[in-house]
Amino acid sequence: FKILNSGDFLNKADAGALENKDSLKLTPSISEKALRYDLTVPFARYVVQHQNELEFPFKRYQIQPVWRADRPQKGRFREFFQCDADVVGSNSLWQEVEFVQLYDAVFAALGLQGVKIKINNRKVLSGFAEVIGESDKLIDFTVALDKLDKIGEEGVTTEMLSKGISAEAIEKIRPIFQLKGNFSEKIEGLREILSSSGAGKEGIEELEFISRALGAIGLETASLDLDVTLARGLNYYTGAILEVSAPEGVAMGSIGGGGRYDDLTGIFGLKGMSGIGISFGLDRIYLVLEELGLFPETVTANTRVLFLNFGDEESLYALQTIRKLRTAGISAELYPDPAKMKKQMNYANRRGIPYVVLAGAEEIREEKLTLKNMASGEQLKLSPDQLIAEVG
């Protein structure tokens, strides 16, 4: 989405384009900026800008809205939130292992069972193009290959032919259309197909390393699947490519993706800075959780202790202990008005607050507080320090 230049943007407009209503020619003269498309490129700019202040490897996560000129429909938005996590300044494959673990941990915590983390490697795709003698058509080849699950083998063949890839070349690579089995079986199939490609064999070794490490560590709920047609972000990914699919039966596109980039900072003048990053499509994840009924029916209260309000003097006494509770890391609040006790207790019940504290005239005299456990109904008269220990 383009943004109009500040001030009198028409002052520098292409007069001819304006007169002829030629929007394509007019746009560059009135709009030099656009809404944020993703979080990866701004991150690369930040790293270059602050390269002398950062400690590498540098890790960060970022959650912000981004904008795309998409036609709005289920799972596609013009404005949506992305959550990115990146590590830059290391080419270690242990980072890939950790990012797969991160995906698995997050989706396990959300209760999403059966999430599939698909993985491929840019070097494997380069190897395919190399063995069929079409390295100069790598992008055309992989863009067509990436559509295999949508348009089928015949559709992919037709598109490759239309891009100038010969029928003989396609025939050489046809075995990848039938590549089936588990991760190890697919790897063995790749070895045969890419036996003459140095880049391809390097990609296979990287995939094997990641698979072996994760096999030894184990995943909680997700599964790792080798998808040799996966080609997202090919313009800047140089190694591992990742994409996360929603559980089977949920009609949704990818809910996450990422990969290894060896020179993304190069566009801003910092060469050879390797990194890897992944993204969570938050809005799509929300839709999946909603469809599967994984949102809780009631929101668990953050407040652990509610102090009833009996008047100004009592509230002042209560706030002294509330401050101590908060200092101890325990969420506490004072009911704002001296309403009827029944109303205040009902408020605590509806919000699921586990403890209620009564601080009336008697408690003030004794320098005590009455703590009520809302689940058991048990009441204890305690000093402020004893109360903190009891609810902490």
Predicted feature locations:
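Short acidic alpha-helix initiation/capping motifs at coil-to-helix transition points
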Residues: 117-120, 148-153, 202
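Internal, well-ordered alpha-helical segments in soluble enzyme and binding-protein domains
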Residues: 99, 121-124, 144, 206
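Polyanion/phosphate-binding surface patch
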Residues: 1-34
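Short, surface-exposed recognition loops or helix-turn segments adjacent to catalytic cores
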Residues: 114-124, 141-142, 224-229
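Acidic, His- and aromatic-enriched active-site or binding-groove loops in soluble protein domains
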Residues: 1-9, 134-155, 246
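Hydrophobic mid-domain F-helix/FG-region of cytochrome P450s
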Residues: 104-108, 123-132
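Positively charged, Gly/Ser-enriched RNA/tRNA-binding surfaces
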Residues: 21-30, 38-52, 59-112, 160-392
